[in-house]
């Protein structure tokens, strides 16, 4: 067919416009005409069809267009390598890269960026060294990609910074912007600030946006907002990325009113329907507004014209951060897939967080299986770390360790998750051994590591070791203790019965003790029956959390235990006067992939009669081997209790009902996992120890503080929780 210059030019312009606008419909129509030879076959045009399909996420079409190119050139290969890397198929991208007859700098940059997206630091560094050895010119794109690939290795980022300065690359805005971003993500805000202010005239919009985000990440929201105002004053263009950065700053300030006002400005400017800005708004409301904020997040979500994967992930994350909405997170995850979005690493991290709150063994396996089927690479550390947390929070410490042991690469988060899992399950010694392995592996601990380690020391009574770790954190690793570390130390001393030392510790804190510290001290006082100190701790908590029932309930329990009925009545009267209500005890267990919920003294479960009959028979067997009901947990004065009232109350606590249902509904020898919304009561704790011995079962109970692993009449908590 004869071809005229105007026909080729028109066709080319339409194709380039389709690529720029990601217009798949027009692009496919043009491709059909191209195949019918309306214009002559051309490597140039074929390359742009590959590029179009890649940008539109149609890898199969991109592959077909590439292999139909008669004479592929280096650009052809670069585009298809990028397409496979973008689709998380980095191994195929590498195979295609190796087939390039004469790769250029762009080829290397493309694959290095692919390795960065895949978090394959080592492979990116090896490729960079090969590139330099073969004499290829390194440019700003090379270094920017390499810095991103080293996002988990601050030591390598520092080395690259030295290389960029010595090589003159510090004059590239893109390189400096990458350093600002990844220094911040690596926890080095000071270095990020130094790079930003050292750029002077090189600073562009990306530089300002990156620095605003950095301040937000480090809870320096006021500085972020000041920088935003300075950016406007200096005449820089404000775009959707800037606005999202400001939302991040407002989120770090927990500034709900300011965020709502900013939302109003976004609506006036017409940015609220943008996916990037919308994602920032959803994140803001979910973090600053709690459960109520999620209603605002849902409204924002509904207004976004075309929610992309990031928006869906943010919505799922918001639900998962609010435990009561975990079911909604799972529903959104499924809905996202139904409309055609394929979950990525972030999707799985968010949904596993929600499933952790639900403690559903069947969902653990489903999510893990789906991650494998979705071709999420086995070396994705973030997904594996999330699976470790999912398994141990669902009571399955063995599978958590199975995932940990098979990870091709471990980082600080991996060790933190596993150490925390051991600590919460009462396996303090194993947690400390793992911490030592972490040090031997050359991975530096962080503040979260020490929270887990100190918690492990508390659970296994290693007071001296705990104090040593606390000192090491400050002196060796230069980590300043935060409120959570002090709370762990108070818990450690309190568990060991060193209440005066714990009180001195709380009084010597460099800042005002928070509710977690006083709650830890109150729990220790309850264990060791120190009424005077308990009253002080409870009163402090009542001031800090005036509507929380926990300090009132714990103090009332202690008064009841000491037979101080008037004081107990006074606490209860105070609760009624302030309209503070204790949450009803609620426990649930999953049997045959179905969740069964039990509430204390509630008869709504369809099998409650059979459960009570089974429990009565179990109680008879337990009493024969030494179980005695601890009636003080009934919280009823002896002279006011009717015959059998105390036994009736204690016998129908939700955790006992859930365990009884599990025993009668599952095979002999099968492990049970029960979740309770409140702290397990002393009598139930003792009763379940006997139930585990009589039934010959391992019973795991997760309350609102920790895990209790009952086996052969003993509990992993050592009877202190």
From Swiss-Prot:
A GO molecular function held by the record: RNA binding
Record carries keyword Repeat: yes
Renumbered residue ranges of the record's region Type DYW motif: 624-721
Residues covered by region (Type E motif): 517-592
Pfam families, per database record: DYW_deaminase, E_motif, Eplus_motif, PPR, PPR_2
Residues spanning the membrane: none
Keyword tags: Repeat
Cysteines paired by S-S bonds: none
InterPro entries registered for this protein in UniProt: DYW_dom, E_motif, Eplus_motif, Pentatricopeptide_rpt, PPR_At4g14850-like_plant, TPR-like_helical_dom_sf
UniProt similarity note: Belongs to the PPR family. PCMP-H subfamily.
Protein name per UniProt: Pentatricopeptide repeat-containing protein At3g49710
Taxonomic source organism: Arabidopsis thaliana (Mouse-ear cress)
């Amino acid at each position: 067919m004869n071809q005229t210059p105007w026909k080729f030019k028109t066709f080319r312009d339409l194709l380039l416009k389709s690529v720029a606008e990601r217009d798949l419909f027009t692009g496919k129509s043009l491709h059909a005409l191209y195949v019918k030879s309306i214009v002559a076959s051309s490597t140039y045009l074929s390359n742009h069809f590959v590029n179009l399909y890649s940008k539109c996420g149609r890898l199969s079409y991109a592959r077909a267009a590439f292999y139909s190119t008669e004479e592929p050139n280096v650009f052809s290969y670069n585009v298809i390598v990028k397409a496979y890397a973008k689709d998380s198929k980095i191994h195929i991208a590498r195979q295609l890269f190796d087939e390039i007859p004469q790769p250029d700098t762009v080829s290397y940059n493309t694959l290095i960026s692919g390795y960065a997206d895949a978090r394959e630091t080592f492979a990116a560094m090896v490729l960079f060294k090969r590139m330099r050895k073969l004499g290829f010119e390194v440019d700003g794109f090379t270094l920017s990609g390499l810095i991103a690939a080293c996002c988990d290795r601050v030591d390598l980022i520092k080395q690259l910074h030295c290389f960029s300065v010595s090589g003159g690359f510090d004059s590239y805005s893109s390189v400096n912007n990458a350093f600002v971003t990844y220094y911040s993500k690596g926890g080095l805000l000071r270095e990020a600030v130094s790079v930003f202010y050292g750029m002077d005239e090189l600073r562009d919009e990306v530089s300002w946006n990156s620095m605003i985000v950095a301040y937000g990440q480090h809870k320096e929201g006021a500085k972020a907002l000041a920088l935003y105002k300075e950016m406007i004053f200096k005449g820089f263009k404000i775009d959707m990325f800037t606005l999202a950065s400001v939302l991040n700053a407002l989120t770090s300030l927990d500034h709900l009113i300011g965020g709502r006002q900013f939302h109003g400005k976004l609506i006036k400017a017409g940015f609220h329907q943008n996916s990037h800005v919308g994602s920032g708004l959803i994140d803001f409301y979910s973090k600053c507004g709690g459960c109520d904020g999620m209603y605002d997040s849902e409204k924002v979500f509904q207004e976004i014209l075309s929610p992309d994967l990031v928006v869906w992930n943010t919505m799922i994350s918001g639900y998962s951060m609010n435990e009561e909405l975990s079911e909604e997170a799972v529903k959104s995850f499924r809905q996202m897939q139904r409309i055609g979005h394929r979950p990525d690493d972030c999707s799985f991290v968010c949904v596993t967080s929600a499933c952790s709150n639900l403690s559903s063994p069947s969902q653990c396996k489903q999510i893990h299986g789906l991650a494998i089927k979705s071709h999420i690479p086995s070396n994705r550390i973030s997904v594996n770390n999330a699976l470790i947390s999912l398994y141990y929070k669902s009571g399955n410490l063995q599978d958590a360790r199975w995932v940990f042991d098979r990870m091709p690469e471990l980082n600080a988060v991996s060790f933190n998750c596993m150490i925390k899992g051991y600590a919460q399950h009462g396996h303090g010694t194993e947690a400390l051994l793992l911490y030592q392995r972490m040090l031997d592996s050359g991975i530096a601990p962080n503040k979260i590591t020490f929270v887990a380690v100190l918690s492990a020391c508390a659970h296994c009574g290693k007071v001296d070791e705990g104090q040593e770790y606390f000192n090491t954190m400050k002196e060796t690793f230069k980590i300043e203790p935060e409120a959570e570390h002090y709370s762990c130390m108070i818990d450690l001393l309190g568990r060991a019965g060193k209440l005066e030392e714990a009180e001195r510790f709380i009084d010597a804190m460099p800042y005002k003790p928070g509710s977690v510290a006083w709650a830890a001290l109150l729990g220790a006082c309850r264990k060791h029956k120190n009424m005077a100190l308990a009253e002080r701790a409870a009163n402090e908590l009542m001031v800090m959390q005036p509507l929380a029932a926990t300090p009132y309930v714990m103090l009332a329990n202690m008064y009841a235990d000491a037979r101080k009925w008037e004081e107990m009545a006074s606490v209860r009267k105070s609760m009624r006067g302030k309209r503070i209500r204790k949450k009803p005890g609620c426990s649930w267990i999953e049997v045959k992939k179905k969740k069964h919920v039990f509430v204390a003294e509630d008869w709504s479960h369809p099998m409650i009669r059979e459960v009570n009959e089974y429990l009565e028979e179990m109680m008879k067997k337990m009493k024969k081997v030494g179980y005695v009901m601890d009636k003080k947990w009934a919280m009823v004065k002896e002279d006011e209790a009717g015959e059998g009232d105390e036994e009736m109350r204690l016998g129908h606590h939700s955790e006992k009902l859930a365990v009884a249902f599990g025993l009668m509904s599952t095979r002999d020898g099968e492990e049970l996992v029960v979740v309770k919304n409140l702290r397990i009561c002393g009598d139930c704790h003792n009763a379940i120890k006997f139930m585990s011995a009589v039934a010959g079962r391992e019973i795991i109970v997760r309350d609102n503080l920790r895990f209790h692993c009952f086996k052969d009449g003993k509990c992993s908590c050592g009877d202190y929780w």
